[in-house]
Each structure stands twice: as structure tokens, then as C-alpha cells.
């Protein structure tokens, strides 16, 4: 019996009795003091949430007040909010293509901040001012690398509001391993330099939202802690609630000091690739009912398939998202949706050269610091775009290709003080090799690789 006792371990965490302070025995099972503490925390948290004790939340807010700041910036006014056409023009400078999505987002963002300014005007109570304006969160649907995150980030830059990005795949229900949804608000608060007022007017972008779709359309009788459970946990935050945010992050504890954040003024933008969603739409409409693109015996090209997918998704209805795995309550809190198109070779070429922070401009600037003038042949730009399109990761592939291409050049050119000019050719791109450096003006012409 003594030999058996020496190998007792917790039935929940697996730690032996030598690794814990106490090991409590039951009929055939054992539990350690650490697991008991964890269970108590989960039960206490559920108890506080169910009671909805506002008094305790207010006390927590007062205790945490030193960690938060008072806003030094005034609330937006109607006159200070850029008009939808101005917003879209600013987006055009940074984001190539996606005209329909930019128009949808410009109107939605304008209405959102107009709503905040309307509520903060402090006008007398009239029938018009008594009308409550509800916010409209945005759902972006599009393939990877098409500009979903960049759109949201550019909007925040223009409006000069805090902006935070969260990954939905890291979130879990309270009480399980992973991040609580309140940690999203903590990121926004940190971006606002712990200024609660500023954070409450910010923008949160939740990426990979399609990855928390439940496994089937029917409600599950088992726990889906990283799918439907996360959707349920996000509902109140998306709609607007006063959330208790632990200032140090991590799991909430019923007795710890928290910062209160009102999410009713925060604009939530959710994005995802939603792979296979077009098939759900086609199934509803009938596969043969949509004849956007002609077919031949050899089948459709990739460009035609991408165009057809975009055309199909323009007929998207909320019920299609339910069938995909989003719960109806979640969809109802994302009333504005926009479908982004896959980037074709022409769009990728434009991304390389046109935006304010285009890759070509970035590398020209880097080499100009070494007194080298960098040029790209039009054929080289086209070859880079072709390779990026082949990799199927959208605009994200462009930087990887250019970094590979420029590695040797960025290594050698700073040490060659006689080189003042260099041209990237199509052959260099296709072979991923560096060419001969350009001689100084007046000497023999460059020989292309």
C-alpha cells in the first residue's frame, strides 16, 4: 500500500503528490489544491457575471482609476468628421482597387462617428435628438492578402483614433486555456496610452473571424470553446456593454481591480477569408442558376474562377453565413458587410508602385540613403506581380518576393561607393539573381542578366 501511495497523482492535472501541497482523495479519483483553486475562480467568475452586480463593478472601476487616464482630446464634432467622399479619397491613396468595399466602409465609418458627435453635442431634448442612433459594425469578406486589415488600419489613421488588431483564433470562452475576449479591449486601451475616453472612440479589427464558425449549422450539445463559445462571448461586446478589463491582462478574477470600458462607441470590424462560402451561396441559388462566366472544354482559367467567386458572393444573404457556421445573433450585430475581390496581376502591379508606401518607393528610399538610384523596369514589375499572383497569398507575397530579389543587392551596394544607379530587370526577377551593377554615366551600358 505504501508503494501505491508514493505514486498518487491528481486526476485532473496529472501532478504527483510530491508536486502539490494537498491531494484530496475521492472514490477512485484525486484532486490537488491547485485544481481546486482554479475551479473556485471559474465558479466565482460565473457567479459575478450572473448577478450583474453593478455596484461591485463601479467599486472595481474606482479602485483601478489610477491605472487609467482622463482624455486630453475633445470628442469629435459634426464639422470635424470627414465626409464619405473624403474618406474614400484617403483610402484610394493607400489601398488599390476594392472600390465597392471602400464605398461601403466610408459610409459606415462616417455614420458611426457622426453618431458619436450627435450624442456628444449636448443639445436640448427634441424629438430628433431623442432618437437613439445604433452603431453598425462591419463584416469584411475576402481572400487573404486582399487588403482587409489595411482598410481598417487606414481608416483609423485618417480619423486619428486608437486602432487594435485581434486574432479570433486565439480567443476562447472564459475559464478555458486561451485569451478572454476582454483582452481585445486591453489592446485598444494600450494603443490609447491607457486613455479610456480615447479607447472608447477607437476601432477594433478582429481577423480570422471565419475560423470561429461552429462546426455544424445545428446548435451543439457539447462545448465548442473556440468556435460558437467565442461568438457568444463577443455578442455583448459587439452590441455595446460596460466591460471590466483587467489592466494587466490575463484571466479576470472576481476580486481584482478592473478598468471599465463602454464598448457602445467602439467600431468593430471583423474580417475573414470565408473559404467555401461561395459554394454555400451557389447551393442556395442552384449551381446552374448563375452563369457569370462562359466555360469551355478545358475549363475556366484561374482569373475567371476568382471573378465568378466574387460575383457569387455579391448575392450573399445572412442565412448563408448561418449555414457557414456563424450564429444568427452574431450576424445580427454585423449589419454592414462588404465583399473584397481577389487581387489580379494588374492590381498587384499597382500595389507595387502607386500607394504612398508602395514597396518600390520603400526600397528606392532605402538605397537613396546609400546614394544609389534604384530603378525597376516595367517588365520587372510585371514579373513580380505574376509571381505573387501564382503564390495565392495576395499582396503579402509581394514583399517576400522583393526581399528575396534585393537581398544580395542590399548586401553589396552599400560597400560599392562608385555605384550610383541600378536597374532591376525582368531576367533578374525570373531567376531571383542579382545582375551587374550599372557603371557610372559616360561608361559602357549595363549588360542585362
UniProtKB/Swiss-Prot annotation:
GO terms for molecular function: ATP binding; ATP hydrolysis activity; ATP-dependent protein folding chaperone; protein dimerization activity; unfolded protein binding; zinc ion binding. Zn(2+) binds at residues 10, 13, 32, 35. ATP binds at residues 143-150. Residues 1-51 form the ClpX-type ZB domain. One of its GO terms (cellular component) is HslUV protease complex. It comes from the Bacteria. Residues 50-80 are annotated as: Disordered. Keywords: ATP-binding, Chaperone, Metal-binding, Nucleotide-binding, Zinc. The keyword Metal-binding applies. The keyword Nucleotide-binding applies. Residues 57-76 have a biased composition (Low complexity). One of its GO terms (biological process) is cell division. InterPro entries: AAA+_ATPase (IPR003593), ATP-dep_Clp_protease_ClpX (IPR050052), ATPase_AAA_core (IPR003959), Clp_ATPase_C (IPR019489), Clp_protease_ATP-bd_su_ClpX (IPR004487), ClpX_bact (IPR046425), P-loop_NTPase (IPR027417), Znf_CppX_C4 (IPR010603). Component of the ClpX-ClpP complex. Forms a hexameric ring that, in the presence of ATP, binds to fourteen ClpP subunits assembled into a disk-like structure with a central cavity, resembling the structure of eukaryotic proteasomes. PANTHER family: ATP-DEPENDENT CLP PROTEASE ATP-BINDING SUBUNIT CLPX-LIKE, MITOCHONDRIAL, ATP-DEPENDENT CLP PROTEASE ATP-BINDING SUBUNIT CLPX-LIKE, MITOCHONDRIAL-RELATED. Belongs to the ClpX chaperone family. ATP-dependent specificity component of the Clp protease. It directs the protease to specific substrates. Can perform chaperone functions in the absence of ClpP. This is ATP-dependent Clp protease ATP-binding subunit ClpX. The lineage of its organism: Bacteria, Bacillati, Cyanobacteriota, Cyanophyceae, Synechococcales.
Amino acid at each position: 500500500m505504501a508503494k501505491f501511495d508514493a505514486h498518487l497523482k491528481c486526476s485532473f492535472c496529472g501532478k504527483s503528490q510530491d508536486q502539490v501541497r494537498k491531494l484530496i482523495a475521492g472514490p477512485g479519483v484525486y484532486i490537488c489544491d491547485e485544481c481546486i483553486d482554479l475551479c473556485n475562480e471559474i465558479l466565482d467568475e460565473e457567479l459575478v457575471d450572473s448577478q450583474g452586480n453593478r455596484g461591485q463593478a463601479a467599486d472595481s472601476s474606482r479602485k483601478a482609476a489610477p491605472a487609467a487616464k482622463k482624455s486630453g482630446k475633445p470628442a469629435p464634432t459634426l464639422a470635424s468628421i470627414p465626409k464619405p467622399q473624403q474618406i474614400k479619397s484617403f483610402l484610394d491613396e493607400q489601398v488599390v482597387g476594392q472600390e465597392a468595399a471602400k464605398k461601403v466602409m466610408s459610409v459606415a465609418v462616417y455614420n458611426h462617428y457622426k453618431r458619436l458627435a450627435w450624442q456628444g453635442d449636448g443639445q436640448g431634448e427634441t424629438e430628433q435628438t431623442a432618437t437613439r442612433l445604433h452603431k453598425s459594425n462591419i463584416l469584411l469578406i475576402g481572400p487573404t492578402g486582399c487588403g482587409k486589415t489595411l482598410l481598417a488600419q487606414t481608416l483609423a489613421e485618417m480619423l486619428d483614433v486608437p486602432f487594435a488588431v485581434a486574432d479570433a483564433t486565439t480567443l476562447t470562452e472564459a475559464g478555458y486555456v486561451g485569451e478572454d475576449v476582454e483582452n481585445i479591449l486591453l489592446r485598444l486601451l494600450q494603443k490609447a496610452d491607457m486613455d479610456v475616453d480615447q479607447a472608447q472612440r477607437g476601432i477594433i479589427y478582429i481577423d480570422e473571424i471565419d475560423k470561429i464558425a461552429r462546426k455544424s449549422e445545428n446548435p451543439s450539445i457539447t462545448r465548442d470553446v473556440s468556435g460558437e463559445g467565442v461568438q457568444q462571448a463577443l455578442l455583448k461586446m459587439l452590441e455595446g456593454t460596460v466591460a471590466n478589463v483587467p489592466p494587466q491582462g490575463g484571466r479576470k478574477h472576481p476580486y481584482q481591480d478592473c478598468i471599465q470600458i463602454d464598448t457602445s462607441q467602439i467600431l468593430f470590424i471583423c474580417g475573414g477569408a470565408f473559404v467555401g462560402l461561395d459554394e454555400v451561396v451557389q447551393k442556395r441559388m442552384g449551381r446552374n442558376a448563375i452563369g457569370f462566366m462562359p466555360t469551355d472544354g478545358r475549363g475556366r482559367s484561374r482569373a475567371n474562377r476568382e471573378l465568378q467567386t466574387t460575383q457569387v458572393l455579391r448575392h450573399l444573404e445572412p442565412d448563408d453565413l448561418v449555414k457557414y457556421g456563424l450564429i444568427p445573433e452574431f450576424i445580427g450585430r454585423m449589419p454592414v458587410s462588404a465583399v473584397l475581390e481577389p487581387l489580379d496581376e494588374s492590381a498587384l502591379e499597382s500595389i507595387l508602385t502607386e500607394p504612398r508606401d508602395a514597396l518600390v518607393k520603400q526600397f528606392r528610399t532605402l538605397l537613396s540613403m546609400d546614394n544609389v538610384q534604384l530603378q525597376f523596369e516595367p517588365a520587372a514589375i510585371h514579373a513580380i506581380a505574376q509571381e505573387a499572383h501564382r503564390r495565392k497569398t495576395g499582396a503579402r507575397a509581394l514583399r517576400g518576393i522583393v526581399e528575396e530579389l534585393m537581398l544580395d543587392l542590399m548586401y553589396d551596394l552599400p560597400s560599392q561607393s562608385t555605384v550610383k544607379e541600378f536597374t532591376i530587370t525582368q531576367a533578374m526577377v525570373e531567376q531571383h539573381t542579382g545582375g551587374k551593377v550599372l557603371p557610372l554615366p559616360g561608361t559602357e551600358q549595363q549588360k542585362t542578366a
